[in-house]
Amino acid sequence: MKNSNKFTRRNFLATTATAAAGFSIVPSNVIAGLGHKAPSDKLNIAGVGVGGMGRGNLRNMKSENIVALCDVDWAHSDRCFKDFPDAKKFWDWRKMYDEMGKSIDAIMVATADHSHGIVAAHAMTLGKHVYVQKPLTHTVYESRLLTKLADKHKVATSMGNQGSSAEGVRLIQEWLWNDEIGEVTKVEAFTDRPLWPQGLAKPAEGMPVPETMNWDLFIGPAKFRPYHRMYTPWNFRGWWDFGTGALGDMACHILHPVFMGLKLGYPTRVQGSSTDVMTDSAPNTEIVKLVFPARPKAAESKINFPEVEVTWMDGGIQPMKPIGWPEGKSMNDDGGGVIFHGTKDKIICGCYGVRPWLLSGREPKVQKTIPRIKDSHEQDWIRACKESPENRTETASPFSQAGPFNEMVVMGVLAVRLQGLEKELLWDGPKMEFTNIRDREELKFCLDTGLKIVDGHPSFSRKYTDPVSAKEFAADLIKHNYREGWSLPAMP
């Protein structure tokens, strides 16, 4: 494997402005003139993280020129490389930006969660349109940063929560705003995930790094640890340093109609509860409560938006079925579900907002007021990329909306990881800080449950970390201290 680690952050910043002068690929904005592109013009798109979801995203973008592919695991990415044999291959996205930055119009990001923010942020500072898989970022701060960078650089953006482009989310919003179920003060949501391992202790020993992988680049901004096949591919979702557990993986799909339909902003109170809170791995099962204050009544809505409590569940548990639930009907629809508890009725939908229905059995007759997406989620982003900022119709999940929404999602992760404080946490959204964690408070986390069964009798010998400052730990969860050599652009 070629060693690409010599390409440093310093090299990237020093050379980006003058890179790629010798390449023959010309970005379509140069051909098209002042930023607006005819629909027939093709974008030059690069993919970062192309072995899993990224491959599917790029296949839905094959109407355009896929000019570069970047991944840290070339064995896992081989199928995508074969899909686009003319695309130049890279290990390091920084080197790709350096060498081909001026030749690329747009970036698709589908790395492990912990790298979403840094890859997308630097792409936008270069003026690139970005499509980022869910969850949008690993932290609250990264979400806020991407929101502001998108606004500053006027690029087309989309998070990869494809249900936001579908019919169900729009119907739910229209039903809510038309007063079909009354005011909503309670929402319950769940997923049947995780499908990957969680609740694990960190492997005691590392393994040799495969020749087809650059492990240092996979680690990226996270704290370094030895390679183990338990971490990637796919399983990164269950490890805190790389993923956000079942909540982060699925709430961007399942809670989207909640965020949009109830016009949510920052939560002000949060709590989490789960099975063992391990140091390195997300729990097998968790419950999170987020409380949002009353919001102003919107012009398009007949209802008020009072304080609302949103409860999330995962790991196999579901809300209790309300009175009137059809006997024998599963609540799990396509991997999860939501119940909007209104003062007059209830809306139930599946994951991605699919197949909404009213508990009463009534079928709402509501005028369609929200524009519908006629093409795929990815193609709608491509459409937005080709429109000038002044005349652009936003995508179904632009960062102006996906950024604040993702802050809500990863706030649930914070609630779970801080549950050892044994209290409801108070959140100041604009300042991105908890207001009721005191300087002297400490936390400790389980390293190993030490479960043993001897003669049919179970025993536990749990091992814990040394106590850490709760305030410092929370601050790092909100805004990570990146590994040396890795950094984000400044907050606008």
Predicted regions: what they are:
Residues K2-A20:
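N-terminal secretory signal peptides and thylakoid transit peptides that target proteins
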Residues T16-F84, G163-A166, V258:
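N-terminal Rossmann-like dinucleotide-binding module
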Residues A32, G49, M53, N57, ...:
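Predominantly a Rossmann-like dinucleotide-binding segment in NAD(P)-dependent oxidoreductases
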Residues H36, G56-L58, K62, C70, ...:
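Glycine-enriched catalytic-core subsegment of oxygenase/oxidase enzymes
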Residues K88-D92:
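Short acidic-hydrophobic, aromatic-tinged amphipathic segments that line or gate anion-handling sites
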Residues K95-K102:
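Short amphipathic alpha-helix with an adjacent loop that forms part of the alpha/beta core around
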Residues I107-M108:
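N-terminal Rossmann-like NAD(P) cofactor-binding module of classical short-chain dehydrogenase/reductase
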Residues A112, G117-S165, D179:
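Beta-strand-loop-alpha-helix segment that lines the small-molecule cofactor/substrate pocket
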